[in-house]
Amino acid sequence: MRIDVISLFPEFITQCVGFGVIGRAQERGLLDLHNWNPRDYAQGNYRRVDDRPFGGGPGMVMLIEPLRACLEAVRAADPQPAPLIYLSPQGVLLNQSRARKLAMLPRMILLCGRYEGIDERFITHEVNMELSIGDYVLSGGELGAAVVVDAVIRLQEGVLNDAESAKQDSFEAVDSLLDYPHYTHPSNHAFGNVPEVLRSGNHVAITRWRRQQSLLRTWLRRPDLIDEARLSKADRLLLDEIKRTHPMDTDQKASVSWRGV
């Protein structure tokens, strides 16, 4: 998959995605990543990329022309059509379902804003989607772009050594439940012992335990996902059993995610 990133700080993106799974994806040719700096397409001795906003107010706004020229160069580098996705807190929220849809694209262009944002006229005429990674504000779109790259590329065939890893991740199943707990050696530790069922060798019991734990975690931490999930009759029976053995009111449920913070 080819991903082009337009950013005033291209080194930021390179550093963020140059390690681990995504770094190996680049080495294997599964991710073709290209960084573009609008400043390289700005005019004048100072290569200015921003100016004061009309109407006054704090901060600066990114100029249309450097962005337009940069985007033209991006499109000229590869004739394959690609949506321009602007990382913005005003965009639609990135979730696993949307990541799967983006992963089906052969190519996409990510646009990172800075300062107070980008001239609205450029957004109106060129941007195909505004995408947010959460209801908070960052200094720029680079972190968001790195998140999108990671979320999308790990879904590409051959990126993960074990394809089942992606299928078992939180939000990845058809019902979008949270993942079950994972344990490794040693089996006994001062922090606690590995549940006996996982050491039993009984794969039917292990599968049931993992499903039950997935339901429990989702019910405690993200009850909204339980409401949206397409649970089977067996799942609902498991969930009813969980609710009987883990009675918690709303305040207690909320405290689970915070762990006392």
Curated annotation (Swiss-Prot):
Q: What would be one Pfam family of this protein? A: tRNA_m1G_MT
Q: Which GO terms describe its molecular function?
A: tRNA (guanine(37)-N1)-methyltransferase activity
> Which UniProt keywords are present, listed alphabetically?
Cytoplasm, Methyltransferase, S-adenosyl-L-methionine, Transferase, tRNA processing
Q: Which residues bind S-adenosyl-L-methionine?
A: 113, 133-138
- Grouped into one coarse class, the protein's main location is cytoplasm
Q: What class of enzyme is it?
A: transferase
Q: Which reaction does it catalyse?
A: guanosine(37) in tRNA + S-adenosyl-L-methionine = N(1)-methylguanosine(37) in tRNA + S-adenosyl-L-homocysteine + H(+)
Please, which domain of life does this record's source organism belong to? Answer: Bacteria
Q: InterPro entries, alphabetically?
A: Alpha/beta_knot_MTases, tRNA_m1G_MeTrfase_C_sf, tRNA_m1G_MeTrfase_TrmD, tRNA_m1G_MTases_N, tRNA_MeTrfase_TRMD/TRM10
Q: Does the keyword Cytoplasm apply?
A: yes
Describe the family membership recorded for this protein in Swiss-Prot or TrEMBL: Belongs to the RNA methyltransferase TrmD family.
HAMAP family attached to this UniProt entry: TrmD (MF_00605)
Summarizing the function annotation, the protein's role is: Specifically methylates guanosine-37 in various tRNAs.
Q: What is this protein called?
A: tRNA (guanine-N(1)-)-methyltransferase
What organism is the protein native to?
Xylella fastidiosa (strain 9a5c)
Its taxonomic placement starts with: Bacteria, Pseudomonadati, Pseudomonadota, Gammaproteobacteria, Lysobacterales
Q: Which gene encodes it?
A: trmD
